[in-house]
Amino acid sequence: MINLTPLCKPLMHAIYAREQRLRGDVEGSQRATLRRLLRQGARTAWGRARGIDGSESYAAFAARVPAAGYEAFRPEVERMLRGERDVLWPGRCDRYAQSSGTSGGKSKYIPLTPQSLQGCHYAGAAYAFASYLHHHPDSRVFGGCNFILGGSYANEIAGLRPGVKVGDLSASLIDRINPLVNIFRIPSKQVALMEDWRQKLPRLVEASLRADVRSISGVPSWFLTVLREVPVSYTHLTLP
């Protein structure tokens, strides 16, 4: 594979520089984020019920809206799962991350809007690579593939409207990833989103052996299982 790291460096440098500017004014960047969220919240049923108009200061917002745990939001999330619009975020949400349900005995469903995926999860991954290249400028990390290990969609909830998917956070991240990232990513989306781990594991190992893997991303315990399987399934590992 052609080493695309030099082509990616200008973008990575820009991302790193932006994050450093934000670190120089942490309070200001947090206030700006709050303002953006309040402007969106003013367009929702949750915000209107609390008199949010998008212009509140932090002190006014904190006084009006006390801190709350997930259970306080469960009724609103269930409305969103049924397809209701403008509940906790403007528009409809069709992706949800499902917790294991170990706390309180009930699964939690976390709405994943396009804005949250882009502004939080994907932005965080981009900054991780940008920071790595800043500290390791001679790296050829984009000269091969990023092995991204993801989960799957469970969709265990009955009566979901068409198009709604519920499952592991990583499944939504892979499903909605920028197509350009697929240049550097293994395995294929079809393999990455497989539900049956017994069928998925050998496919993951095979994909890793056929690629020049330069970085890995995923839940450590899951990845440990994959890495342990490599020498079991193959007598030697030869990367192209």
What is each model feature region?
Residues 1-29, 34-51, 55-237:
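Active-site phosphate/ATP/adenylate-binding loop shared across adenylate-forming ligases
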